[in-house]
Curated annotation (Swiss-Prot):
Domain notes from UniProt: The architecture of this protein is similar to that of Src-family kinases (SFKs) with one N-terminal SH3 domain, one SH2 domain, and a C-terminal kinase domain.
Subcellular location: Cytoplasm
InterPro entries (alphabetical): Csk-like_SH2, Kinase-like_dom_sf, Non-receptor_tyrosine_kinases, Prot_kinase_dom, Protein_kinase_ATP_BS, Ser-Thr/Tyr_kinase_cat_dom, SH2, SH2_dom_sf
Binding site for ATP: I201, G202, K203, G204, E205, F206, G207, D208, V209, K222
Full protein name: Tyrosine-protein kinase CSK
Alphabetized PANTHER family for the sequence: TYROSINE-PROTEIN KINASE (PTHR24418)
Quaternary state and interactors: Homodimer (via SH3-domain).
Amino acid sequence: MSGMQAVWPSGTECIAKYNFHGTAEQDLPFSKGDVLTIVAVTKDPNWYKAKNKVGREGIIPANYVQKREGVKAGIKLSLMPWFHGKITREQAERLLYPPETGLFLVRESTNYPGDYTLCVSCEGKVEHYRIIYSSSKLSIDEEVYFENLMQLVEHYTTDADGLCSRLIKPKVMEGTVAAQDEFSRSGWALNMKDLKLLQIIGKGEFGDVMLGDYRGNKVAVKCIKNDATAQAFLAEASVMTQLRHSNLVQLLGVIVEEKSGLYIVTEYMAKGSLVDYLRSRGRSVLGGDCLLKFSLDVCEAMEYLEANNFVHRDLAARNVLVSEDNIAKVSDFGLTKEASSTQDTGKLPVKWTAPEALREKKFSTKSDVWSFGILLWEIYSFGRVPYPRIPLKDVVPRVEKGYKMDPPDGCPAIVYEVMKKCWTLDPGHRPSFHQLREQLVHIKEKELYL
């Protein structure tokens, strides 16, 4: 370890760069790709005391491991850093200057909307190859077909196959970073060879969620094949690298495969979504202590996001998962942004979203608090859809006039009071998650939920 490197504090996560078999009894052997947690620095700064995922402790060499970091906020990650979007033929030629054989980029076709153009510099000229999109496949010569642009570029990188040159050097779009490089740099890139995909456990618009095995551990894997969708999910994965809490679904790593897309690997939550868990068990199985525990689990996760200046924007029982040991964890960080961000998030779940967020796109921790109140109602109604018997188009006008849902059957009055505080129309008068957690802890300690 160089003298310049700062000492890693206890709790720092590292990922192994090489295998280490250990030479002394006190050493902790590990394999490349293992995640280790620093316990303490030793007298020799080149060695740390660390523990592995099963809790075994020992001494490790600092130069064999890499500190895991959050992917930097504000970086534009790209699976396709060579993709420049809507630029003209002339702009592409300027970008590929000075000429360098094999320098290339891909742009949207100006003459054929929906198609793409591969632009390749070759012996002082730029050749433009139309990429035809037909029957959900891409092709240049209508002989070889590809699922997506990444596959196509990968193919012509290994073999010119009729082009003027094979693709040698991507012209990276200014301001973007290749996703694979950034996940590797920050210690989150996993190896596809270590992952076995076992069975589909969920389907989404983006692709499949699969049960997987990563080095002997059960994991959940989001498999995203489509270029544009994968690009959107990169943002979710990069947010997850910055978050660590026992009530947030934990990212284990990311695999970027040119041939087959993006894989986001997270801890496996055996009991599925909280909304399904509540509906399938109901009042006869789940007592008041259990409902309050789930409420507190979610509140603690949200207090952590609040303290770290993140806004979830899509908090609902469908986006909370339940582990084998009945711990509720918040997931689905697809819309999560740093608090300062005001980006439009497209379609919003009307019944869960605060009025000011729907009306003015004003998202804040306080709009998450509104959603938490709706989630509490879901928990205490055992998974009912909020605002029963009110047509969707009438929900917002009624809420803005001050309408609040009645308490679910059997809901303790003190818990209903918490819900109503979350549904205060003025965001400034809603409680913080810190205050909400204190109120829920008080209810638990005094057994007021009975």
